[in-house]
Amino acid sequence: MTSTQARIREAVRAGSVRDYARAIRILEELAASGKAEGCHHPDGGAVYERGAQEEWNEGSSESHAHGGDGTQDAYPEIYLYLARAYHAQRQYARAVAYATVYSRRVPRDGAGWFFLGRSYLALHQGGYAVAALRRSVRENPASLGAQALLGLAYLRSKKPRAARMVFEQALAQYPDNKRLNAGYLNSLFVEAVQHLKRGSADLARQMFTFLINQDVDGVAPRLYLAHAFRSLKHFPEALTQYRAASAFAPHDPALKWYEAAMLVEMGCLSQAAALLSTLGVSIERDQISDRFLVMGAVRKHMEEGAWARAASAAHLYLKTFGGSVEIHLLMAEVHRRAGRVNVALNHYTRAMKIEPKNCYPHYGLMVCLQEARRWQELAKAIRRAEGAGCDAQDCYYYRVITAAHLSNPPEEVLPHLQELARGGKADQLLFNALGVTYVRLGMADLALRWYEKTLLLDAEDEEACVGLIACYEALCDDARAYTQYGAYLSRWRDNRVIRKDFIAFLERTERWSEAADHIELLASGERGGFWGTRLAFARKKAGQYRQAAIIYRALLRQRPDERVLLHNLVYCLDKMGQADAGLRLLRAACNAFGTSVESRLIEGVLCLHTRRINAAIRTLRAVLEQQPGYTAASELLAKAYALASSRA
């Protein structure tokens, strides 16, 4: 066993007892020293994944490659173990980086793709997770863990049919596995809901019936099954299922409205009226209609904030009775509250087509576009609203707010905003518009007050949270800007633009370790892994020399003749206490690609650090012969002479 193999086994043992910090330190030292790289045979050994909860000391057959031409052996499994250790530490972006490197080095090993997919899934990047896990299953079809995780990745990517097929195939191999069966039933449920929404009511009925028979029971399965029966006009069966749903949630009044609607469909008006009276709704028999009752169910769900059920009920109404302004407005509101902006806009537009002069769809559309900050579209919507006869003051209000967010001169917009404020307007939309206008005028101190007013009304207002960042940066208040960036990204973690701004801020304020972490997080969401030199530089500036050296080595594999990368790698090795290794690497690179004054100077420094005083003197003299007057070389040479004389 080589010393490298012994060190790897030591790291594996540390990982097996959850001493991940020690395992990472050992593995990063090996990777930084180049032990993970080298010439490896394409059919080199593989590490086989044995499940997501596999212990470190299982399945650890080594995948190092032996250099048949006398080159140093490579141990790419170092990257795999690093990926697993960082995943265990919940540092998923770094886990992705190392798993990516390993999978490129050993592409036939399903374990690498498995752990890459697992870390992508932890970062909520379902598409990348699916691609990695599909490759894992292809390389190792017998892997139960990879198949289960692939099914989950498909589910999270909103592809229930693909998920169900994966679980079905896995169950054919492992029919008694409870995890696979649970995944299969979950994916079948989501697929059944999709079939119902697309109009395949009979297929949905069969699927929901199967699920209930498999003990996947409760309000949701019964409610969806009832909707399926209703779409098929099987009203008695639908009534039975609505009552079954109510039995699971007896205090949910919305479910009673469905029962009443079915009683009306079946001609039982007296029973429907009696049921409604228990809900506090007094209505004559001849005034009861199924339309009224389904609409009532939609409204009840909305009152309770049950947006998914409200959307389902509204969809049922639309399929049964066709479109109307009222139902499209309700559906738009449901989808707007659920964050599905484009679907909401579609329903507002459909309502406008039914009644072009009805102002309510125009107001709803303007609110939706404003919340989504789609200002160019809002400007056009305002003109349409004016043409439909909407209130002139309301249109003026939206026009001024929109102007503040477009490329209009802020000094021209400000008087209109001030007029609105004097007129009694006191809402967060106006406050934010005043904030952005003052920022553009260079009056961040005034802007700050308006954003703070907004946040008193709504602490979750995203525009105001971003506005505070801009104000603090303009006022050079780095401490508050730093805090606000952190607060914002903890709430809206997917905003890549703000994260890039935060990285620039962290670099400017020399918070290098945190800058590197955020660079890594951004890189995990893009094909290509590391952000190259920027990440390596941040790690180096943070004093994280092992991690920086690993990245510089990866970059040098792509650009082996680039001097800056070489010099930075050697610098990191020196800081790690591996000046000897750095010196050997530098000399080898100079022999291969030629030397330079800077390289010779660094060689002189390394000779001094390794106590090769005579070699340092020769090297530094050569530098001064090539470039007389080089101050750094002169100072180092004087130091070398002093060391030589002290030894004499």
From Swiss-Prot:
Record key words, sorted: Repeat, TPR repeat
Tree of life domain: Bacteria
SUPFAM superfamilies in UniProt: TPR-like
TPR repeats: 1-30, 76-109, 110-143, 144-177, 219-252, 325-358, 428-461, 527-562, 597-630
Xref: PANTHER family: LIPOPOLYSACCHARIDE ASSEMBLY PROTEIN B (PTHR45586:SF1), TPR REPEAT-CONTAINING PROTEIN PA4667 (PTHR45586)
Listed name of the protein: TPR repeat-containing protein TP_0095
Lineage: Bacteria, Pseudomonadati, Spirochaetota, Spirochaetia, Spirochaetales
